[in-house]
Amino acid sequence: MIVPSACNEANKGDIAKVVLMPGDPLRAKYVAENYLENPVCFNTVRNMFGYTGTYKGKRISIMGSGMGVPSIGLYSYELYNFFDVDSIIRIGSAGGIDDSIKLRDVVIAMGASTNSGFANQYTFPGTFAPMASYTLLKHAADAAEKIGAHAVVGSIFTADQFYDANSESAAKYREMGILAVEMETAGLYLTAAKAGKQALSILTISDLVFTGEGLTASERQDGFTQMMEIALETAWKSLD
């Protein structure tokens, strides 16, 4: 069946029920080629690569989201509503804010505060709190414990800007217990909530906002490997 999307050339049935979603489409390609068995590419439009393969005998897809709330909002909306995807697991990097957060830590985002206006479209009579699927979150926490990863479950902040003109923002986030900042999760959680589907973000801390410390390219890859193992096990378990 042909799906009415200008951004995804897949047909119904090409995409699995659970999708891993890194921001970088080249990372999606890397994961497909190195972690999935018999990956098949289902999308190349705008170079937003998408693949479906198997992991430990279960069908899993991976597709890039691009950067920012509008981009992940578009791709996740189509996956949920046009391609019958049940669960999306974002995998990406984040900047650590809380003093307890260290480089290479994995943060499992329970909720995502945001300064994005993305939720305005829903005319919700109040301030909606974008939250993860508890089922996916529990699977991820269990997977992290199983492999011995240092994973922290808590709240993050999804920013609409990378370069913030307000130098006090990060300190204000920290005062409210925010662990880390990134640019996509709230959009994913809002889209999932509206569609009645499941979503989770699993993030590697690649830099620390207040100290300026950051991982090298090789160190980022090591941290990414741990995050990927957690995400794959979470996806696999969600298909039980």
Model-flagged regions — what are they?
Residues 139-147, 191, 230-238:
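Generic non-transmembrane alpha-helical segments
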Residues 21, 25-28, 68-72, 129, ...:
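Generic structural signal for well-ordered, non-membrane alpha-helical segments
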Residues 1-130, 134-136:
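Metabolite-binding pocket within alpha/beta catalytic cores that recognizes anionic/polar moieties
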Residues 127-176:
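Active-site rim beta-loop-alpha module in soluble metabolic enzymes
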Residues 209-240:
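His/Asp/Glu-rich mid-to-C-terminal helical/loop segments that flank catalytic regions of hydrolases
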Residues 186-220:
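Zn-dependent metallopeptidase/amidohydrolase metal-coordination segment
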Residues 37-44, 148-154, 239-240:
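Flexible, glycine/charged-enriched surface loops at secondary-structure junctions
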